[in-house]
Amino acid sequence: MDRAIPDPTWKRLGFAEQPDFHTSGLGVGIVIIIIDSIKQHHLVNHLNTRIKCVAVHENMTVSVRDISSMNREEDNRKGEHGLMSVLALAHEPILLEEQIHVGIAPAATLIVLDHGAFTTGEGERLKKGMEWILEHGVEWNIKIILSTGWQALDNEVYLKNTSENSTVKALATAVQQGILVICSNGNTRLNNIMPPIQYLAVGGYVDRGKADRSLHVPFPDEPYGRNGDGHFRPDILAPRLHLTIPSYETEDSGQRVSFYGGTSGSATLVAGVAAHLFSQFPSLSAEMLRHLLVEHGEPLEGNDNLAPRINVENTIRYMNRADKPRYITKTLPMISIKNQNLYSAIHSIDDTERALSLTVLVERDELSREELWSFTKDSSAIVRKIAVSTLGEPMNEQERKLYWVHLMHETEGGVRGWYMHGLLQNAPKEEIHNWIKWSTDINWSVRWCVSEYLAQYPEYFPQLEKTQDPDAIHIKALPLREWYTAL
């Protein structure tokens, strides 16, 4: 191993003791809507009939089968994301450096819904699959839907009301039936869109693999703010890096653990917590559970993101009180520009209204390039991201120089990412002097662009290894920086 084994995920979530392998999540069904599929692996065989794969095919027929009966995929990467989610939820106990690691809800029933995500017609297939599960899977007692790719095929920068999203439309019936939808809030500030208020949106933070909360810090590229309806997202934060699961990559590698990460991992852990609580407190409603997790989370000091860190023990302690008050559901107003003049709304004092208007005008192709440039000076990063992403790559050498100037003065990481993405297109090797300094930017997409730029010229430049870990950014960039200093 090239790193110390982190604390068990259950400790990092604030459990006072490890989840019981036989009872945590018992009687609770979780539908996992994944971004690819799931592959068969011996590490999930212990789930036996408690794990199913429901597939919706292009002709809208539905099939269901046990994961254990599936053939091993020839493509070893296919189904990996789904497998990691299942392992984080339900892997068997393993002893690592005198600490027991176990899935958060190993007794739950897991239904993996493969609906051909991120391909044309996915919304209709997702709706069909959920309808089938709710009709035919009564014995599964579905209480939770875990979605790690809710955005579907939407442009993730263009801001719209969330009701227009195909996933939101497909899951509307399930939400109305009181099923808790838990979804990842997004991995980088490069994007604008965030989940609807009806979902429990999960962001992440850096816990350095430790349960000790004094060591926790914000993730520097964490997306947060108002979604297309004007509602603040995310609701809650969970660890997002170095989430331990049993090693699944090669059975003879000698490795004992693999690592899950990103807000897909964070959301999966929270789904496990929800299943654990539903099994302990069967009378809990989805709305009440969501409220309790947020209300009894812990603020993260030094963070502008208002979402708290999850703390399971705080929530359980409150639930065990006899005098707990009743929770009253609140309905928040939604921002909409449907009845407004776009050319008036584009100058609104509300940045969400400006972003919604700019999105419509851009999609209608009603703005000149000069007008788009004017929106790169907007006070809102949401608006600037839409403008810069729409500009795309520089049109000529003069505009390319302007990109570099704007990049230098841009304070928001996501906007910098879009300038860098534009500059990456047709970038000459002679520009190396402009690229080096961005190898340690806090924004993932900026560093990704630097890495991709260097990869275009491997015979000329050292390479930059990509990392999501903010503590490793400068370490990964050190060889490149030392090479450049020695020139």
Regions flagged by a language model, labelled:
Residues M1-H22:
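Autoinhibitory propeptides
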Residues P19-E124, W140-I142, P195-Q198, R226-R233, ...:
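Subtilisin-like serine protease catalytic core
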Residues H22, V28, E92, H115-Q198, ...:
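Substrate-binding/access-modulating region of protease and related hydrolase catalytic domains
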Residues D36, K52-R65, I193-S279:
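Extracellular S/T/G-rich loop segment that most often corresponds to the catalytic His/Ser-adjacent loop
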Residues I142-I145, S279-S344, S348-V360:
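C-terminal subdomain of the subtilisin-like protease fold in secreted/lumenal serine endopeptidases
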Residues Y327-M334, T352-R364, S374, K385-N396, ...:
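Structural detector for internal amphipathic alpha-helices that build alpha-solenoid repeat scaffolds
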Residues S336-A345, D365-T376, N396-M408, P428-W438, ...:
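Amphipathic alpha-helical scaffolding segments comprising HEAT/armadillo-like alpha-solenoid repeats
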Residues I349-D350, S379-S380, T411-E412, I442-N443, ...:
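Short inter-helical turns and helix N-cap capping residues of alpha-solenoid HEAT/ARM repeat scaffolds
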